[in-house]
Amino acid sequence: MKRIVGRLLLLLLLVSCDNHKPTKLIILLVGDQMRPDHLSRFESLYTGGFKWLLENSVVFDSAYQQHGYTVTGPGHFAIGTGIYPGPGGVLGNEYFDRELGRVVNCVEDPKAHPVGGVGTARSITRYKTKGIGDMIKDADPKSKVFSIGGKDRAAIFLGGQNPDIALYYNNRDRFISSTFYTDSLPEWVNEYNDNMNLKAYKDSMWNKILPDSFYIKYSRQDYFNGEVDFYHDDEHDLNDNTDKKKNIYNPVFPISFDKGVDPGKEFLDTPWFDEKLFGLSEITIKNAKLGSDNHPDLLCIGVSTMDYILHNYGPYSQEAMDYFLRLDIVLGRFINYLDQQVGLEYIEFILSSDHGGLPIPEYLPSLGMEGGRVSREHLKEAYEWINDEISEIYGDNLFVRSGAKFYFNHERLRKNNISLDKPAQVIKKYLSKVDGISAVLTKDEILASKEKDAITIRLKNMVHPEKSADVFALIKEGYLYRSSYGTSHGSPYDYDTHVPLLFAREGRKYHHINHHAETVDIVPTILDILNIQTEINLHGKILPIK
């Protein structure tokens, strides 16, 4: 009897192993300014891609970008490499480069040229850190890696050092690349670009896809002070033959392009862009034959549009809600296409975001939070006082300021035997008086700190020992540098660092895990899924998804 039971158990084990399909394709979806509640608040309304992802996923409820400057470049870098952005040298979307003596774009490449259309050549040439795609290719040179994004830095940091290609929107009418990656675009990409026909959208109107009652229940009223209003044609003077706009503040649906605006230049700001982004992703899967063999492939997709919409209207707006409902539909079509082209049983999906975001400050009281907008005038005044006093005591040009970050001339400090602490105290004296500034810190103070709280850890993970600013201001919780309208991100606080993170696969039981996870955990977890070993000292850990 025991022998029979043993044989039955062995048979069940073999059947189980036979049903475990190999992973042929990794789909890495990265939102921009997406918060976890964009999944949870609208979960009952989702019918497409988000619904499928959630129903077949393990969701990490306590997932964070564990670094202190939460913007697009560093966030995508952390996801794509498994390395914190500070040690990796990705100090922001733009930052002061001490060697060059100027502010640089994080993915600029002066030696490269645009490929496929007019635009700016970008690449990862400033960094040597390998990405997840490089690690996959190191293990299997026949694997293919494609990275596509609305923003250049999204596509580039997700793609790593050696993708087959990185494609990004040129803010005109096409997806382009640079000579760092290729000398020419594949013909199917050129054909797709030629057929996008963005000018046809010039009269398109963004309307809600559900009745008003749903938006009142799941978001807030449409007109809300603090939202950005770019569209003014709805209230211009119809009797004015010059069609001169009155620019009346009216941030409500419907939304469209103002008269005379080239749709291509603002297309990334609209929900229609996602249709083009995932359309390009579909033809990439087909023409590059991704997932067609047993050499695992990677497709990274940077969903950049949501950042523009959330900057303009905030995470609780009707516009944000409608955007995610529309993206749900687009994702649903994309997942259906993948099922037909590859088979969902062979695909691992990962969804996360480069950072979260603060609700519009004017809405914070409704959430029981305090906040506001730092006065540009007060900041300007403080900067002038700082410059005047430091120049008077130590001479001109002792530092370079980039935003609220101060880079000192270390050679002059050493030559004149000046301790950095002394001019730093001048900066602290004036900036600490500005309403909305929580603290003024030095790089050395952060690195020397023994504190183990989340804020200190995140600040440390954003520091590069040589390249980072010497002194910088830490904004107060709930405050923005952005003035007048809209919202933003960039702080080390939970509303900016807390991001969605899920791993989805057909048949996986939907469940939530509440223990701490980080975006740098994505790379080692993908490697574990693919049974790939790496000698790289990754900052992340393998997450329990099986």
Report the location of each language-model feature.
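Bacterial Sec-dependent N-terminal signal peptides
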Residues: 1-22
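Active-site-proximal N-terminal segment of extracellular/periplasmic enzymes that hydrolyze or transfer
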Residues: 18-58
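Non-catalytic, well-ordered alpha-helical segments in soluble enzyme domains
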Residues: 52, 129, 133-137, 403-440, ...
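Short, solvent-exposed turn/loop segments enriched in Gly/Ser/Thr/Pro and often Arg
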Residues: 61-80, 147-157, 302-304, 353-356, ...
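Secreted, luminal/periplasmic, and some membrane-associated catalytic domains
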Residues: 62, 93-119, 161, 173, ...
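His/Asp/Glu-rich, glycine-adjacent segments
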Residues: 84, 92-295, 304-311, 435-436
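A long, amphipathic alpha-helix that forms part
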Residues: 267-293, 306-347, 424-430
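Substrate-binding rim/cap in mid-to-C-terminal beta-strand-loop elements of soluble/periplasmic
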Residues: 377-418, 488-530, 544-546
